Amino acid sequence: MSLIPIVVEQSSRGERAFDIYSRLLRDRIIFLGTAITDEVANVIIAQLLFLESEDPDKDIHFYINSPGGLVTAGLAIYDTMQFIKPNVSTLCMGQAASMAAILLAAGVKGKRYALPHVRIMLHQPMGGFQGQATDVEIQAKEILKLREELNDILVRHTGRPVEQIQRDTDRDFYMSGEQAREYGMVDHIFTSRLSILPSATS
């Protein structure tokens, strides 16, 4: 079990203790630092909805360092990002692979960021098939449908032609931060918070 740091703050009412993720949430920062599971997705969705209810006109900042995970869980986060009113800016630190890369690209155009030494990876959805032949066929068809959906999302957010997306995601496709910027996955590469324009943090 991982250790979650506690932050203690002084106020007029005395000391208040927050776990680090709750403290970040006060600054409208959501941090994805694990694989994407149903449980993780539900927490992130709840945070997105909470921040929308707090202020529907203020940006939400979504920081990502994730190897990816369940496609259906990731799509639930993606749909919520598109559904809510606030702009969701995304920032990759470390890695954004598979479904996490899709979430990175899904930030609002112009506010998708990466740090200099990130690794971003795209590939087609994977699944282990077992059971009777008809069951395997059904599962294979579902994987193909998911692949088509994910490719359409990448086309929408990167501006790349679907033929290129299909070709690039056929196998693991790695990008540096600068390559991801050229590809249309992110808009800016930052080495320091000081280099972020005020408009990027609003």
Swiss-Prot record:
Subcellular location(s) per record: Cytoplasm
CC terms in the record's Gene Ontology section: cytoplasm; endopeptidase Clp complex
EC number: 3.4.21.92
Keywords from the named record: Cytoplasm, Hydrolase, Protease, Serine protease
PROSITE patterns hit by this protein: CLP_PROTEASE_HIS, CLP_PROTEASE_SER
UniProt-annotated catalytic positions: S98 (nucleophile), H123
SUPFAM superfamilies in alphabetical order: ClpP/crotonase
Broad EC category: hydrolase
GO terms, biological process: protein quality control for misfolded or incompletely synthesized proteins
Catalysed reaction, written as an equation: Hydrolysis of proteins to small peptides in the presence of ATP and magnesium. alpha-casein is the usual test substrate. In the absence of ATP, only oligopeptides shorter than five residues are hydrolyzed (such as succinyl-Leu-Tyr-|-NHMec, and Leu-Tyr-Leu-|-Tyr-Trp, in which cleavage of the -Tyr-|-Leu- and -Tyr-|-Trp bonds also occurs)
Superkingdom of source: Bacteria
Assembly description: Fourteen ClpP subunits assemble into 2 heptameric rings which stack back to back to give a disk-like structure with a central cavity, resembling the structure of eukaryotic proteasomes.
Family indicated by similarity: Belongs to the peptidase S14 family.
Summary of the function given for this chain in its UniProt record: Cleaves peptides in various proteins in a process that requires ATP hydrolysis. Has a chymotrypsin-like activity. Plays a major role in the degradation of misfolded proteins.
Protein known as: ATP-dependent Clp protease proteolytic subunit
